[in-house]
Amino acid sequence: MADLTSPGISVSRREDGIGAEVSGVNLSLPLSSEAFAAINEGFERYRLLVFCKQDLSVKQQVEFSERFGRLEEFPDPKDQAEGYETVLRVSNIERESGNIKPVDDPGHKSFTLGTSSWHIDSSFRTLPSRASMLYGKEIPAAGGDTMFADTTRAYDAL
């Protein structure tokens, strides 16, 4: 059952207890103010939103992300997705050849070591980001999990 609704959009709490799933929206198309307001209200309430079955270009992801506020920049072009300095490309696929990097590849290994530990994106900044947006292009059937925690709920439980 939907907890929040807007014409055609439904925001429903996920059964696993964290976040909500948003349905009835195509993020590759421009969003009305009302539709974005429903999504933003869902974000404020649940802190984690899942949008299934989306097909976005990097440009479309940036346009949607900008609705939430100013985006962080990643100045090193090798880290950027298609030249967008506000999108960090995270991949085990080599950009030039399209080959999958071996697990022992120094660049891949240093990245996975740095991200495999629990962390909160941008927590080191004076003003941390409001959110992180992930868009998976090729998701493995098993493994490669990204985990989330509701730190507000954890703090309130202390």
Where are these regions (language model features)?
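Non-heme Fe(II) oxygenase catalytic core, chiefly the N-lobe of the double-stranded beta-helix
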Residues: 2-158
